UniProtKB/Swiss-Prot annotation:
Organism: Shigella flexneri
Annotated cofactor note: Binds 1 heme group per subunit.
GO biological process, one term: negative regulation of bacterial-type flagellum-dependent cell motility
GO molecular function ontology, one term from the record: oxygen binding
This protein's name: Diguanylate cyclase DosC
Top-level EC class: transferase
Residues the UniProt record annotates as site (Transition state stabilizer): 338
Length: 381
């Protein structure tokens, strides 16, 4: 990514250096004179799109976005060589914000198209000569295109990182009590194994036993486990073990005489033992792999730490927009925390934080999310 930004800096610098200073001055003049009108017209057109409207409330547009758009137009069209590096950083920051709140890249691209469309008549209605108008337009469009490319590339990178964090949070939230889930599934497959062993040893018959894929463990693995652990190699190994043993199981069910033969019966029992043993080993490895996601948990309070706050807020904002419900965030600041630490020691301070976290969590309804914002702050969404 750094190499890309360096290349774009060179290209943007080259555009500014090669442009006639008079043309650059006229582009800056257009920007200063018309940025306010352009920002108003820009958001008027963009907000017609129903998809874009989801992200652009009237209050938000009036309070923040129009003035930000004005500054952006002036900065890009008035760029000097010394401004280029700062402008690239601005595009990167804007892209990160877009990715964090979930604005799709197609809306950003539509916005650039609208801006170039409304800029054209502004430039060509000026009193510049025809040649100057054309050069100002070319310089302005090329400047906007470079800014757009930098922003889009940074957006894609930020969106990819955000998606990974979304996936990490999904796994973390689904398997927050991973140890308990692991033991539950191990007990489930062992119970299935013991049930079959008893039937084979006592009756030489599988009776109404289900194949592994249809037993409780198999159903959990195929409908939940595969989804939770998608992308981890052990998932494929467990899937193949289940499939292979189901083949042996179904063959034995079709030919019950196999279990009347002692050597074949022993072979079948060894196969089930070997399969279950391998699956349990792989299952433990899966949960160990997932345990690394616990870096998303504050060690002291056992609450979500700041790592997942952008993911949580993005999800909550999307839900509030979709349902038209208000969204509030409560920040709880533990008062006199430094004084407590200095007077009674860090162990006492830690115990107070644990107590506050426990009581706060206990009093929250299940749909609310409590996270540790910093060493002394809790956030409730």
């Amino acid at each position: 990514m750094e190499m890309y930004f360096k290349r774009m800096k060179d290209e943007w610098t080259g555009l500014v250096e090669q442009a006639d200073p008079l043309i650059r001055a006229k582009a800056a003049e257009i920007a200063l004179a018309h940025a306010h009108y352009l920002s108003i017209e820009f958001y008027r057109i963009v907000r017609i799109d129903p998809h874009a409207e989801e992200f652009l409330s009237n209050e938000q547009v009036e309070r923040q976005l129009k003035s930000a758009m004005e500054r952006w137009i002036i900065n890009v069209l008035s760029a000097q060589v010394d401004d280029v590096e700062r402008l690239i950083q601005i595009q990167h920051t804007v892209a990160e914000v877009h990715a964090r709140i979930g604005i799709p890249v197609e809306i950003v691209e539509m916005g650039f198209r609208v801006l170039k469309k409304i800029l054209y008549p502004v430039i060509f209605s000026s009193d510049y000569s025809a040649a100057e108008k054309l050069q100002v337009y070319h310089f302005s469009i090329n400047s906007i295109d470079i800014a757009m490319e930098v922003m889009t590339r940074a957006f894609t990178f930020s969106d990819s990182s955000a998606s990974k964090e979304d996936e990490n949070y999904r796994i973390f939230s689904l398997l927050e009590n991973a140890e308990e889930e692991k033991e539950r599934q191990i007990a489930s497959i062992l119970s299935w194994e013991i049930d079959i062993i008893y039937k084979v040893l006592l009756d030489s018959d599988l009776g109404s036993s289900l194949p592994l894929s249809q037993a409780d463990f198999g159903l959990w693995f195929n409908h939940k486990g595969r989804h939770y652990f998608s992308g981890i190699a052990e998932v494929g190994h467990i899937s193949r073990l289940i499939q292979d043993f189901d083949g042996i199981f179904n063959q034995t069910m079709r030919n019950t005489r196999i279990l009347n033969n002692r050597s074949l019966r022993v072979k079948f029992l060894l196969q089930i033992r070997n399969t279950v043993s391998q699956i349990i080993t792989l299952l433990r490895e899966l949960f160990e792999e997932v345990s690394r996601h616990e870096v998303g948990m504050d060690v002291l309070t056992k609450l979500l730490n700041r790592r997942f706050l952008p993911t949580i807020f993005k999800r909550e904002i999307a839900h509030a927009n979709r349902t038209g419900t208000p969204l509030s965030v409560l920040i709880i600041d533990v008062d006199k925390f430094k004084e407590i630490n200095d007077t009674w020691g860090h162990n006492t301070g830690d115990e107070i934080l644990r107590k506050v976290s426990f009581l706060s969590q206990k009093r929250l309804v299940k749909s609310k999310i409590l996270g540790a914002g910093s060493s002394r702050k809790l956030a409730v969404s």
